[in-house]
């Protein structure tokens, strides 16, 4: 698959285009140009490392939204076996922006739930651009309760710009569905491991992201609103999105500093889409480590630690200034 380059990656794109030209010319050339191709490849890798070593929060948000970035189904297909998708909320409809079902992880039966975006126009519409409606969150809730009933670990993958804000969704209780999920996940009697793989947009992300281990991919984002949305409110212009991204603290490193996530999963240079096998291996290792650690605790201890985590959010200290 041909890589789609972002605006700030254009110097890399130009080098890669030259490499492709040389590869094409090599087939009809009597001169060996493999050394030149190798030199340009090394230069491209060095440039990629340099650019990705100093990304701004706004640029990271663009990487998090990259159209070729691995989605939940990609992780399910690569990390789990015997996946059996479960459909519907048993109340209204089946929401294709949320997928979930039973699977095996290293031979152990687990429940997997995640947001799912689309690749082409048809699939994007089918998946509602990864924006769940109330029935999607209620489907997720049904699967969470099944996981609890059968005492199996729960894995969630977060990648959404936010919950769908349409009139129908609001009429069917979007905020209630999100709030109910938060309430149930806070006391779910199984290990819960949440991984932000792309965009973690507001309550739409949080509705499947309350757990015992919260981890993020290196170039994922997690925030109460998109940078564009924040800029539109504060400055009445989405053009200020880069400034908003800087202020909001949407990156994995910033959130780790604040104690809102537990672990950052390193991505290949250039992002998860540049080397999906390496990304899958890194995520699998992180999931294995988290599951092994959580299974050492009793359910009572898990719930106690989860409660302490939730009650610890938003704490601050007052300091007298003399």
Swiss-Prot record:
EC annotation from Swiss-Prot or TrEMBL: 2.1.3.15
Species the sequence originates in: Nitrosospira multiformis (strain ATCC 25196 / NCIMB 11849 / C 71)
Residue ranges of every copy of the CoA carboxyltransferase C-terminal domain listed in the record: 30-293
Functional note: Component of the acetyl coenzyme A carboxylase (ACC) complex. First, biotin carboxylase catalyzes the carboxylation of biotin on its carrier protein (BCCP) and then the CO(2) group is transferred by the carboxyltransferase to acetyl-CoA to form malonyl-CoA.
Name of the protein: Acetyl-coenzyme A carboxylase carboxyl transferase subunit alpha
Alphabetized Gene3D superfamilies for the sequence: 2-enoyl-CoA Hydratase, Chain A, domain 1 (3.90.226.10)
Pathway this chain belongs to: Lipid metabolism; malonyl-CoA biosynthesis; malonyl-CoA from acetyl-CoA: step 1/1
Gene from which this protein is expressed: accA
Listed GO biological process terms: fatty acid biosynthetic process; malonyl-CoA biosynthetic process
GO molecular function: acetyl-CoA carboxylase activity; ATP binding; carboxyl- or carbamoyltransferase activity
């Amino acid at each position: 698959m041909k890589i789609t380059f972002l605006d700030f990656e254009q110097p890399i794109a130009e080098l890669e285009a030259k490499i492709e030209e040389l590869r094409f010319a090599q087939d009809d050339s009597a001169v060996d140009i493999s050394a030149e191709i190798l030199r340009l490849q090394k230069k491209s890798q060095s440039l990629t490392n340099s650019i990705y070593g100093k990304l701004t929060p706004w640029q990271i948000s663009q990487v998090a939204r990259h159209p070729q970035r691995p989605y939940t189904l990609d992780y399910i297909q690569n990390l789990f076996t015997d996946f059996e998708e479960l459909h519907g909320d048993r109340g209204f409809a089946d929401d294709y922006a949320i997928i979930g079902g039973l699977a095996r992880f290293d031979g152990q039966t687990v429940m997997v739930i995640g947001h799912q975006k689309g690749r082409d126009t048809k699939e994007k519409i089918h998946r509602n651009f990864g924006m769940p409606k109330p029935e999607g969150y209620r489907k997720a809730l049904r699967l969470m309760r099944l996981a609890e009933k059968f005492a199996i670990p729960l894995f969630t993958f977060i990648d959404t710009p936010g919950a769908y804000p349409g009139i129908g969704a609001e009429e069917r209780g979007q905020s209630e569905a999100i709030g109910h999920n938060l309430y149930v996940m806070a006391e779910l009697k199984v290990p819960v491991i949440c991984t932000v793989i792309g965009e973690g947009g507001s309550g739409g992300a949080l509705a499947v992201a309350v757990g015992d281990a919260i981890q993020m991919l290196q170039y994922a984002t997690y925030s109460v609103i998109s940078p564009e949305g924040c800029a539109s409110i504060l400055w009445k212009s989405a053009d200020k999105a880069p400034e908003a991204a800087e202020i909001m603290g949407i990156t994995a490193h910033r959130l780790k500093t604040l104690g809102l996530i537990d672990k950052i999963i390193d991505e290949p240079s250039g992002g998860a889409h540049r080397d999906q096998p390496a990304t899958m291996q890194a995520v699998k290792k992180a999931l294995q480590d988290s599951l092994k650690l959580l299974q050492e605790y009793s359910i009572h201890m898990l719930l106690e630690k989860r409660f302490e985590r939730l009650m610890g959010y938003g704490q601050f200290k007052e300091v007298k200034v003399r």
